[in-house]
Amino acid sequence: MTNIRKTHPLLKIINHSLIDLPTPSNISAWWNFGSLLGLCPNNQILTGLFLAMHYTSDTLTAFSSVTHICRDVNYGWLIRYLHANGASMFFVCLYIHVGRGIYYGSYTYLETWNIGIILLFAVMATAFMGYVLPWGQMSFWGATVITNLLSAIPYIGTTLVEWIWGGFSVDKATLTRFFAFHFILPFIIAALVMVHLLFLHETGSNNPSGIPSDSDKIPFHPYYTIKDTLGFLALILLLLLLVLFSPDLLGDPDNYTPANLLNTPPHIKPEWYFLFAYAILRSIPNKLGGVLALVMSILVLAIIPLLHTSKQRSMMFRPISQVLFWVLVADLLTLTWIGGQPVEHPFITIGQVASILYFSIILILMPLASLIENKILKW
């Protein structure tokens, strides 16, 4: 008799996605981050749901409702910090996942890659709106500064900003709508993840060599379910260490001060996972130019497949490209550091050099390196 998992309409989908899925036998630990990105939103939705039960999206009570969650709700502090630090873990996994895609040439699966970029934008938007909800100083001023960037759009900019605010400044209407969007977006993200996986399973997974592995496939279960479980345990351990020992390590102390529109913090900065883009924004003295650079810092990912000039898919056997890739990683870490520094010498210059290097590596140096490597292959 045929196993029910192969005949039942619903179980059949799960079976083809998680159990009998033919998977390359040589995929490394870098492929674990895909499954970890399935775990992270589940944690966020679950903890977020419990937080939403106690949170009030009103400018007068938002800050005190978060305080109430931490002080009076049973394990409220744990739920809150799991949610906040869970977002940090989410972005760590996201950035490594994207980096792995660039390194091993996974961007040649165009549909999967493009849905991934849309997912990245959606997650960034969700995280930004979530940061506004506690209504601390950095929440308020972060929301004011970032939404104000839209005013750089010619003709419709100012109208657009006031439309998003629901008034003439960031106020009650803004907070309410941000809460509504922050609640609904994770479910839209979950739907997009399904589409992402649908396109991935059309082609099958890439592997470190970048060579088609149809002749060497193994079932996903038990091999990769066990491997992914190890990844889950490592991520949960890291998250719990962060939450239980230093929950405020990645936060901003200014956000423990209630929002005050009469008092601007000395250094307005977003959460650490946006600092690289924030540094690129600040490195351009022109407002519209800065906004375009900010958007392009992520949108440049969509151009990468068009600039693939190498005869090989993966960087596994391309030493020049490998060096450039790790320089790019170091550059992003430098930008992250600069984004958290005040706008003064020498940070301005370092930020500008790092921003130019970021775009140069992706748009000019990597395609050139690939062409040189193609020539070397003929020698």
Curated annotation (Swiss-Prot):
GO CC, alphabetical: mitochondrial inner membrane; respiratory chain complex III
Cofactor binding note: Binds 2 heme b groups non-covalently.
Location (main, coarse): mitochondrion
Membrane topology classification: Multi-pass membrane protein
Chain sites annotated for binding heme b b566: H97, H196
Cofactor(s) required, per the database record: heme b
Binding annotation for heme b b562: H83, H182
Subcellular location: Mitochondrion inner membrane
TM segment ranges: 33-53, 77-98, 113-133, 178-198, 226-246, 288-308, 320-340, 347-367
Leader sequence residues: none
Molecular function as annotated in GO: metal ion binding; ubiquinol-cytochrome-c reductase activity
Keywords associated with the record: Electron transport, Heme, Iron, Membrane, Metal-binding, Mitochondrion, Mitochondrion inner membrane, Respiratory chain, Transmembrane, Transmembrane helix, Transport, Ubiquinone
Keyword Cell membrane: no
Function: Component of the ubiquinol-cytochrome c reductase complex (complex III or cytochrome b-c1 complex) that is part of the mitochondrial respiratory chain. The b-c1 complex mediates electron transfer from ubiquinol to cytochrome c. Contributes to the generation of a proton gradient across the mitochondrial membrane that is then used for ATP synthesis.
Entries under PANTHER family matching the protein: CYTOCHROME B
Further information: Heme 1 (or BL or b562) is low-potential and absorbs at about 562 nm, and heme 2 (or BH or b566) is high-potential and absorbs at about 566 nm.
Protein family per UniProt: Belongs to the cytochrome b family.
Subunit structure: The cytochrome bc1 complex contains 11 subunits: 3 respiratory subunits (MT-CYB, CYC1 and UQCRFS1), 2 core proteins (UQCRC1 and UQCRC2) and 6 low-molecular weight proteins (UQCRH/QCR6, UQCRB/QCR7, UQCRQ/QCR8, UQCR10/QCR9, UQCR11/QCR10 and a cleavage product of UQCRFS1). This cytochrome bc1 complex then forms a dimer.
Protein name per Swiss-Prot or TrEMBL: Cytochrome b
Native source organism of the sequence: Sylvilagus nuttallii (Mountain cottontail)
